[in-house]
């Protein structure tokens, strides 16, 4: 059922960062493939070190299927289905019953926070991270010797937030009252060299959204948002909440029909979870406490980045959230039925709202129009001239003109670099005051792609 819920993603075209990743991964030599995994910056490097789930992913599917996003999406959904199977298996191992495992899988599978991870192809790294992290954890709990280390390395190659895995394993051992530091040593021997190479050789990402803020209050605010998103709040809600968690006036005008549904269902779910938590207060064991701690630990890489909070970061943390909620719920009966109805109603309705508002959908539509237009009308790049998208509609603000909307959808010049197979090809946008080349200008209407 969750696969059916997110199956509309199959129709979503490439957009934004997808084009950059397609361009970088379009290699022709074996040495370029090895560049994917190098910690030394090179032409095949991207902003983050995620070679397995980004460069290799885009390279393999582009090589097999060209610029056709459907096979990419089929693979992503297949991996998501496999991650649900792994969640069921791990939950059964930790919570001992099929009923609890099924509850966890339902909660995770229908969560609206999965939207970005499944609709935006460049977010596939989160799905890969979840798969390899869960395989590592399960193999570790089964006392496998080498397999969990291999999966840990694959998780690190998927996304850097896998660095919390050894700490997750430590907490799971603590929950069993059986901590073996020697057993964790191999993970540290992998982790410390990785951290050195990742931070000091590959380097860190700069930018306003990646500035660390050690403020406990900011971290608490960020944690609250990840909890709200885990319950089912739409990601867009963060843009409409002011000081004291009060909705700003624009929230009610932008969502006249939706705001009662959003707030009503969210409050209902939070109230019911609060009731279940209070009901079991004082009767919690180490296992439940470990799930709460693991939720926070999994968020540590982003918890102190208040300007960089997004639902796609919930891939691994959501696993522990669902485990904790399942721990609060009975295995059958009216209470379970009531909560599942409330939870599914919130998340299914927010999935519908998110589809109508999410950038991956809107930008995908624009990007497809641009790609098809230029494939038909300019299948070969014109000589001694350049394209410039102009602002020919007043629908958008001065700061976010129509040409900027196009630029955000196609990744600036990246779509054209893929289309014309030229790593250095540039197009221009009226909103961006760049120096134009001394060539003939070909103005392109932005309006025709935004209708």
PLM features: residue spans?
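Polytopic membrane enzymes that build or remodel cell-surface glycoconjugates and lipids
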Residues: 1-451
């Amino acid at each position: 059922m969750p696969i059916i819920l997110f199956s509309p993603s199959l129709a979503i075209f490439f957009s934004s960062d997808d084009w950059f990743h397609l361009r970088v991964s379009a290699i022709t030599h074996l040495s370029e493939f090895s560049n994917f995994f190098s910690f030394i910056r090179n032409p095949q490097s991207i902003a983050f070190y995620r070679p397995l789930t980004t460069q290799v992913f885009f390279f393999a599917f582009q090589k097999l299927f060209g610029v056709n996003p459907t096979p990419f999406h089929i693979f992503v959904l297949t991996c998501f289905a496999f991650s649900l199977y792994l969640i069921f298996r791990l939950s059964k191992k930790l919570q001992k019953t099929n009923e609890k495992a099924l509850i966890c899988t339902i909660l995770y599978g229908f969560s609206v926070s999965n939207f970005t991870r499944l609709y935006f192809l460049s977010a596939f790294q989160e799905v890969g991270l979840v798969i390899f992290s869960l395989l590592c954890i399960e193999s570790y709990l089964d006392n496998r010797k080498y397999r969990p280390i291999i999966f840990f390395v694959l998780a690190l190659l998927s996304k850097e937030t896998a660095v919390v895995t050894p700490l997750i394993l430590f907490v799971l051992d603590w929950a069993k009252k059986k901590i073996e530091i020697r057993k964790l040593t191999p993970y540290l021997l992998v982790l410390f060299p990785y951290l050195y190479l990742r931070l000091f050789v590959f380097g860190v990402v700069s930018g306003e959204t990646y500035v660390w803020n050690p403020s406990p209050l900011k971290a608490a605010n960020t944690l609250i948002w990840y909890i709200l998103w885990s319950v089912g709040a739409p990601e867009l809600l963060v843009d409409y909440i002011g000081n004291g968690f009060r909705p700003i006036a624009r929230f009610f005008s932008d969502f006249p029909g939706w705001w009662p549904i959003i707030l009503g269902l969210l409050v209902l779910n939070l109230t019911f979870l609060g009731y279940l938590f209070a009901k079991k207060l004082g009767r919690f064991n180490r296992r439940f406490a470990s799930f709460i701690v693991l939720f926070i630990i999994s968020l540590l890489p982003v918890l102190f980045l208040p300007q960089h909070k997004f639902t796609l970061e919930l891939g691994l943390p959501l696993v522990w959230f669902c485990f904790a909620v399942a721990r609060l719920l009975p295995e059958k009966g009216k209470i379970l039925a009531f909560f599942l109805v409330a939870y599914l109603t919130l998340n299914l309705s927010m999935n519908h709202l998110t589809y109508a508002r999410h950038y991956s959908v809107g930008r995908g539509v624009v990007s497809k129009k641009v790609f098809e237009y230029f494939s038909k009308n300019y299948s070969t790049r014109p000589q001694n001239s350049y394209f410039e998208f102009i602002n020919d509609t007043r629908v958008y603000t001065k700061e976010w003109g129509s040409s900027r909307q196009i630029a955000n959808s196609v990744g600036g010049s990246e779509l054209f670099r893929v289309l014309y197979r030229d790593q250095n090809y540039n197009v221009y946008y009226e909103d961006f005051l760049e120096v134009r080349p001394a060539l003939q200008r070909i103005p392109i209407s932005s309006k025709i792609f935004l209708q």
